Amino acid sequence: STLAVVSVSKYLNKARNTAYKDYEKTLEGAATNYFLDHTGLLPEINDPNGTNVLATTLINEDYLENMKDPTNKSFNCNNNSYVIVTRKDNVGFNMDLEYRVCLVCSKYKSSSCGG
């Protein structure tokens, strides 16, 4: 029955989208922890380019697990994914940091990747 195939396909797409969103959140959390431990790498206030940390760096330094590609298990989403941190004015003693996650998998690219 065609209906069953369509339902399964929609379910799989939803599961994949959830996996991508989870990876994006995990990447952001890993980058947050990385920069807590490496504050010297944080960008200057209002530097528009910010500082970039690669997913592979986060994996190599044990902040992040290997991210298997949900669409193709023989690939992963590690090599082209990264996080950019930018720094706005300090708020009291706290730094106002913004994290932009770029997750790149075989059939998915975060909207914040640009280009």
Model-derived segments and their meaning:
Residues 39-87:
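Extracellular/periplasmic head regions of type IV pilus-like filament subunits
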Residues 4, 23, 53-54:
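Generic detector of short, well-ordered, non-transmembrane alpha-helical segments enriched
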Residues 9, 18-21, 32, 61, ...:
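Intrinsically disordered, low-complexity segments enriched in small/polar residues
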Residues 61, 73-115:
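Short, surface-exposed interaction loops/tails
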Residues 1-15:
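C-terminal juxtamembrane segment of a hydrophobic transmembrane alpha-helix
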Residues 10, 14, 21, 25, ...:
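Context-gated lysine
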Residues 11-49:
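Conserved hydrophobic/amphipathic alpha-helical signal-anchor segments
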